[in-house]
């Protein structure tokens, strides 16, 4: 599977918050995020998972071919002001009886942000 890089910045966080209705201030207000012990504003977990899901769907030839997809959040994606963060996604596909098992990796600055990320697709 070919690696893909997704760009995450504060503007994307704002657009995602507006689209999803998740206006939790840890995703937009730096002072609030720091007041609750975070290093800075963080990306929505479901945004991160959604971007990795897009990687899976694109590789599978469409979302209808994705039979299962799961992951665990292991580290927040910190998005400092005036910065673009690279979410690097790649994976290994193994074919079994016409289905592909994908073992996925999602990292920021070399650190894993999703754990146990996997999918089952028909291609």
Residue ranges of predicted features:
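Hydrophobic residues in beta-strands and at strand termini
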Residues: 8, 73, 121-123
């Amino acid at each position: 599977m070919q690696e893909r890089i997704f760009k995450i910045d504060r503007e994307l966080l704002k657009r995602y918050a507006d689209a999803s209705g998740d206006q939790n201030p840890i995703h937009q207000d730096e002072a609030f995020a720091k007041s609750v012990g975070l290093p800075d504003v963080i990306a929505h977990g479901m945004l991160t998972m959604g971007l990795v899901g897009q990687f899976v769907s694109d590789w599978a030839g469409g979302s209808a071919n994705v039979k299962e997809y799961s992951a665990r959040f292991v580290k927040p994606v910190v998005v400092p002001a005036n910065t673009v963060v690279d979410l690097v996604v790649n994976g290994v596909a193994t074919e079994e009886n016409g289905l592909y098992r994908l073992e996925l990796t999602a990292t920021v600055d070399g650190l894993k942000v999703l754990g146990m990320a996997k999918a089952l697709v028909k291609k």
